[in-house]
UniProtKB/Swiss-Prot annotation:
One of its GO terms (molecular function) is structural constituent of chromatin. The lineage of its organism: Bacteria, Pseudomonadati, Chlamydiota, Chlamydiia, Chlamydiales. This is Histone H1-like protein HC1. Pfam families: Hc1. Transmembrane segments: none annotated. InterPro entries: Hc1.
């Protein structure tokens, strides 16, 4: 079997499994049985596909076409999106005046120490 034939068989089996799964979900017992048997067939064909794909890769049959290679390179070369740079606008008389009023100057708070009272224990009894 060729690699293309094996891939075609796998896609056909997957489609039939999918259709039978929909029927089995609705309660069709025969469809559920078909899903089980087809999944076993799929396993066997998948093993064959793995072997054939490894052989094809070693022989150089699975190289990308030039069109696919160019698309991959173009996708890799695209730069990441630039982050937005927010520029501050120049102050006009109205905007600067309102900003100055909005931010009042804070005065430094004076620190006051609370008096700590210590309990004195008498040692006399």
């Amino acid at each position: 079997m060729a690699l293309k034939d094996t891939a075609k068989k796998m896609t056909d089996l997957l489609e039939s499994i999918q259709q039978n799964l929909l029927k089995a979900e609705k309660g069709n017992k025969a469809a559920a049985q078909r899903v089980r048997t087809e999944s076993i067939k799929l396993e066997k064909i998948a093993k064959v596909y793995r072997k054939e794909s490894i052989k094809a890769e070693k022989m150089g049959l699975m190289k990308r076409s030039k069109v696919a290679a160019k698309k991959a390179k173009a996708a890799a070369k695209k730069p990441a999106k630039a982050t937005k740079v927010v520029t501050k606008k120049a102050c006009t008389k109205k905007t600067c005046a309102t900003k100055a009023k909005a931010k009042p100057v804070k005065k430094a708070a004076t620190k006051t120490k609370a008096k700590v009272t210590k309990k004195v224990r008498s040692t006399k009894k």
